[in-house]
Design a protein with these regions (language model features):
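N-terminal cap/lid segment of alpha/beta-hydrolase-fold proteins
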Residues: 27-89
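Catalytic active-site module of serine/aspartate enzymes centered on a nucleophile-bearing elbow/loop
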Residues: 339, 343-367
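Conserved acidic catalytic loop of the alpha/beta-hydrolase fold
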Residues: 195-216
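Gly/Ala-rich beta-loop-alpha elbow adjacent to hydrolase catalytic centers
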Residues: 218-227
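The feature captures the conserved acid-bearing segment of alpha/beta-hydrolase catalytic domains
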Residues: 247-324, 328-330
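Active-site glycine-rich loops that stabilize anionic/oxyanionic intermediates
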Residues: 98-110
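Conserved alpha/beta-hydrolase
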Residues: 114-140
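Short beta-strand element of the alpha/beta-hydrolase
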Residues: 91-99
């Protein structure tokens, strides 16, 4: 009779484990994202210094409350950039810029745990660059101080992002009703660590494009207006896709429209020279707005401010296109996508939203 030793059984068990692991890899390989490289860097920024001489003995510890800053520097006001380059990458990367109160998280995993635009477009072989603008998120070191509030304002964000009213979701909204998803949404809000400085932000993102070369800028909300200004600075921006730009529309001098009033405010545009403005006519631009935006003034400020933004965006599109530009404005309900919030890239139907962008990139020869 054949005798089986404990060593033999260990070898059999090991072989079975290896075989199982390999078979699992084969089964799931179609879901794997294969990267050529990934990493992070900073772009732009400033350096300030304090006069004097640094004493590494007397001032070389963090503990003293009265520690001197004499002779020391502070590197801050840069953008923080995380990038991933897939194997067999397309030539033009997508650079994703978040909105107000947000960070690069808005492009990553959705509040309900699905893949965001980061992975969706990696799977389509686009290099992706995700940034935290100066004085936000991982780019938090500011050269100017500020006070960070601990105000209880979750429900304000709930309304501004058009999830619903108060704590009630809009009927048919493309946001998960699961409490855990709402919890994740609230926890992605990100404060500024210094005063908001639009010029500083646009310089940093322009420096990013100086570093990586030609690419496509994808903005959201507050970064929409800063995106136009960055394109005026940098010819490496080959196109812009903007999700619900909320402010910062620039018009040629003499063609700035009247402010558009909304509940508790008014949306104002600004002027640039016609020579500067022409730059915006040289690149294709697409703008997307979601659902639950009224056509007429309403009392709900979470809706009414986006009515003003959509109205201004239409006027801006018309001015750019009259001067030979190529701006497409897509109101998602009009193309069959209903229920979208202020951040369609994180909605339940974000795959369909991404497909619209993919098709536009292909149509414009940017793929």
């Amino acid at each position: 009779m054949m005798q089986f030793t404990s060593s033999y059984f260990r070898q059999v068990l090991l072989a079975l484990c290896v075989a199982f692991a390999l078979s699992s890899c084969v089964i799931s390989r179609e879901n794997v994202i294969v990267l050529e490289r990934q990493g992070s860097f900073t772009a732009g920024g400033t350096v300030i210094s304090t006069p004097g001489t640094f004493d590494s003995i007397a001032d070389g510890a963090f503990s003293p409350a009265d520690q001197s800053t004499a002779g020391q520097t502070l590197h801050g006001d840069h953008a923080f950039v995380f990038y991933q380059i897939p194997v067999d990458a397309r030539p033009l990367p997508l650079v994703f810029w978040h909105g107000y109160g947000q960070s690069m998280k808005t492009w990553q995993t959705t509040p309900d745990g699905r893949e965001g635009f980061q992975n969706i477009f990696l799977r389509q072989r686009y290099p992706v660059y995700l940034l935290d603008q100066p004085r936000r998120g991982q780019a938090g070191r500011s050269t100017e101080p500020t006070t960070i509030s601990a105000a209880t304002n979750d429900q304000l964000w709930f309304g501004i992002f058009r999830l619903g009213v108060g704590s009630e979701l809009y009927p048919g909204v493309q946001f998960s009703p699961e409490p855990a998803a709402l919890d994740q949404f609230y926890r992605q809000m990100t404060p500024d660590t210094g005063p908001l400085n639009i010029e500083l932000n646009t310089k940093a993102v322009s420096a990013l494009f100086d570093t990586i070369g030609p690419g496509i800028l994808v903005t959201h909300s507050h970064s929409g207006g800063m995106g136009w200004l960055t394109a005026l600075k940098n010819d490496n921006i080959m196109a812009i896709a903007s999700y619900e730009p909320g402010s910062g529309f620039v018009f040629p001098e003499g063609e700035v429209p009247e402010p558009i009033p909304y509940v508790r405010g008014a949306l104002r545009a600004s002027a640039v020279s016609l020579e500067e403005f022409r730059r915006l006519t040289e690149i294709p631009i697409v703008i997307y707005y979601g659902d639950n935006i009224p056509n007429q003034p309403v009392e709900n400020p979470g809706q009414d401010q986006w009515r003003a933004s959509l109205t201004m965006a239409k006027a801006w599109r018309d001015v750019v296109n009259r001067r030979g530009g190529d701006v497409t404005l897509v109101h998602l309900p009009e193309v069959g996508l209903t229920g979208n919030t202020h951040f369609p890239m994180s909605d339940l139907n974000n795959l369909a939203v991404a497909e619209l962008l993919s098709n536009w990139l292909k149509e414009k020869g940017l793929d």
